């Protein structure tokens, strides 16, 4: 059964389930991402198939307390009349680094959703959506200053850049189509520790086809816009019929 469960991480990296921390959700809800707030007191999630967002308060012992209006369906007003909830797919979350604002990709209508949240409880309030010229936006990241937001767009293998001068109203300022290395899709993305480069994972949906699996590297200019470096992408091999999914950049000196 689909659920959310909290774990303790030991100094050796073992995961130990926290008693009574499991929150079960209906079968077929398809939880896809969880994201902890900067103060580590709240947790937000997307459920792709059921078309809802969930928010939780993280209690001192690690258990999860669901927020007052959770689960919260995506607003019907943003979708074509009569479209069923399965077409209301949220995918990809990011929190503004200093403001109580949550960003959510509305995948099926190519828009970026903006929510505010209560810091004490995690209660979400829908504010608006803004357009994304990319197709099927899936993953989101912001820079540490909270001035730029980036989405990886699976449908057209691109990255969209937003200006966050007003964090509640992101404004698209660029869309970059990634260099082609076969039929593949942009998935997760990350910024390096000094935010000089943005990396994006490309993958094929089939583990039996490796052409197109790669790592794209884009230079981050002073204004936060992007340009892909000439050596990009780096082809990634398939190991045991796997494909790449997920990426993080760390400081090797840390």
Please place each PLM-identified region on the residue numbering.
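Beta-rich, blade/repeat-based domains predominating
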Residues: 24-41, 74-101, 131-147, 179-197, ...
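Structural signal for beta-propeller blades
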Residues: 2-4, 51-53, 110-112, 157-159, ...
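Asp-box/WD-like beta-propeller blade repeats and closely related beta-sheet repeat scaffolds
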Residues: 1-33
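Short loop/turn segments immediately following the C-termini of beta-strands
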Residues: 1, 9, 48-49, 58, ...
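Beta-propeller fold detector
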Residues: 15-24, 64-76, 124-131, 171-178, ...
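Loop/turn-rich, solvent-exposed surfaces of beta-rich toroidal or solenoidal domains
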Residues: 136-211
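Short loop/turn segments immediately following beta-strands, especially the blade-tip
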Residues: 6-15, 55-65, 114-123, 161-170, ...
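Blade-level signature of beta-propeller repeat domains, shared across WD40, Kelch, NHL, RCC1
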Residues: 204-206, 210-254
């Amino acid at each position: 059964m689909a659920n959310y469960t909290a774990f303790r991480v030991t100094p050796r990296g073992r995961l130990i389930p926290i008693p009574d921390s499991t929150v079960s959700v209906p079968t077929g809800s398809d939880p896809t991402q969880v994201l902890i707030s900067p103060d580590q007191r709240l947790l937000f999630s997307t459920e792709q198939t059921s078309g809802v967002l969930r928010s939780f308060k993280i209690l001192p012992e690690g258990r999860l307390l669901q927020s007052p209006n959770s689960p919260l369906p995506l607003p019907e007003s943003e979708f074509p009349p009569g479209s069923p909830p399965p077409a209301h797919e949220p995918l990809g979350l990011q929190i503004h680094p200093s403001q109580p604002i949550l960003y959510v990709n509305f995948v099926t209508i190519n828009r970026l959703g903006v929510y505010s949240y209560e810091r004490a409880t995690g209660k979400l309030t829908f504010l608006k959506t803004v357009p994304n010229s990319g197709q099927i936006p899936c993953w989101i990241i912001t820079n540490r200053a909270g001035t730029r937001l980036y989405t990886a767009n699976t449908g057209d293998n691109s990255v969209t850049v937003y200006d966050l001068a007003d964090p509640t109203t992101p404004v698209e300022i660029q869309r970059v189509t990634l260099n082609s290395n076969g039929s593949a899709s942009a998935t997760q993305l990350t910024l390096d520790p000094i935010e000089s480069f943005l990396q994006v994972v490309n993958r094929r949906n089939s583990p039996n086809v490796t052409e197109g699996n790669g790592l794209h590297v884009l230079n981050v200019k002073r204004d936060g816009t992007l340009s892909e470096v000439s050596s990009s992408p780096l082809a990634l091999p398939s190991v045991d019929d796997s494909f790449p999914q997920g990426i993080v950049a760390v400081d090797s000196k840390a």
